[in-house]
């Protein structure tokens, strides 16, 4: 027993030092050196202060802002420490009720808008924290935002088109808009 205890303790201490201290600090240092913005959380700053992350959705509720996808994190929306989908199946009555409620809220915010509501405005992403919406979802909200900000719809559309990003590698996903970036651009205009 004594002959195996000392080597086991030494191996335990060495692996703890290597895997628990040296490796994490080395990878963090390399990450900060090679990808400084991403290693710090992809923070978006305005006037020297962090206003959000380009990777985590935020809950915009004012009608003068574009709204992102619903958050599936609970009990607080857009809580990065509680990331995950709702795990509700497509026939689950709770999901159907939530989607109907979100559709009703969108229609109440812009009663004159008769267009079909884009699916990404009423369903949460797999992480529950998606910072982006489809261009179609931005166009759907465009009349409300333009009216609330007393802007021409064409001006808001031009802003959406300028900020939108194409499909990843030309064919993955769809064209998308980062909601935080778009709302900050609206505030700076």
Curated annotation (Swiss-Prot):
Keyword terms of this UniProt record: ATP-binding, Cell inner membrane, Cell membrane, Ion transport, Membrane, Nucleotide-binding, Potassium, Potassium transport, Transmembrane, Transmembrane helix, Transport
GO CC entries: plasma membrane
Localization of this protein: Cell inner membrane
Superkingdom of origin: Bacteria
Primary location recorded for the protein, binned into one broad class: membrane
GO molecular function: ATP binding; P-type potassium transmembrane transporter activity
Membrane topology classification: Single-pass membrane protein
Transmembrane segments: 10-30
Keyword DNA-binding annotated: no
HAMAP family: KdpC (MF_00276)
Function summary: Part of the high-affinity ATP-driven potassium transport (or Kdp) system, which catalyzes the hydrolysis of ATP coupled with the electrogenic transport of potassium into the cytoplasm. This subunit acts as a catalytic chaperone that increases the ATP-binding affinity of the ATP-hydrolyzing subunit KdpB by the formation of a transient KdpB/KdpC/ATP ternary complex.
Alphabetical list of PANTHER family matching this protein: POTASSIUM-TRANSPORTING ATPASE C CHAIN (PTHR30042), POTASSIUM-TRANSPORTING ATPASE KDPC SUBUNIT (PTHR30042:SF2)
Subunit details: The system is composed of three essential subunits: KdpA, KdpB and KdpC.
Family in the record: Belongs to the KdpC family.
Protein name: Potassium-transporting ATPase KdpC subunit
């Amino acid at each position: 027993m004594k002959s195996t205890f000392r080597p086991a303790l030494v191996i335990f201490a060495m692996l703890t030092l290597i895997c628990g201290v040296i490796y994490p600090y080395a990878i963090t240092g390399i990450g900060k050196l090679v990808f400084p913005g991403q290693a710090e959380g992809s923070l978006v700053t305005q006037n020297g202060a962090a206003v959000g992350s380009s990777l985590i959705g935020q809950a915009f509720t004012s009608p003068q802002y574009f709204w992102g996808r619903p958050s599936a994190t609970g009990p607080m929306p857009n809580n990065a420490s509680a990331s995950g989908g709702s795990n509700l199946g497509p026939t689950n009555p709770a999901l159907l009720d939530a989607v109907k409620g979100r559709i009703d809220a969108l229609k109440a915010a812009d009663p004159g808008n008769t267009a079909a509501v884009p699916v990404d405005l009423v369903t949460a992403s797999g992480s529950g924290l998606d910072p982006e919406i489809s261009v179609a979802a931005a166009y759907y909200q465009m009349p409300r935002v333009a009216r609330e900000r007393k802007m021409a719809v064409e001006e808001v559309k031009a802003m959406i088109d300028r900020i939108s990003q194409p499909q990843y590698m030309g064919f993955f996903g769809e064209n998308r808009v980062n909601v935080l970036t778009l709302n900050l651009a609206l505030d700076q205009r």
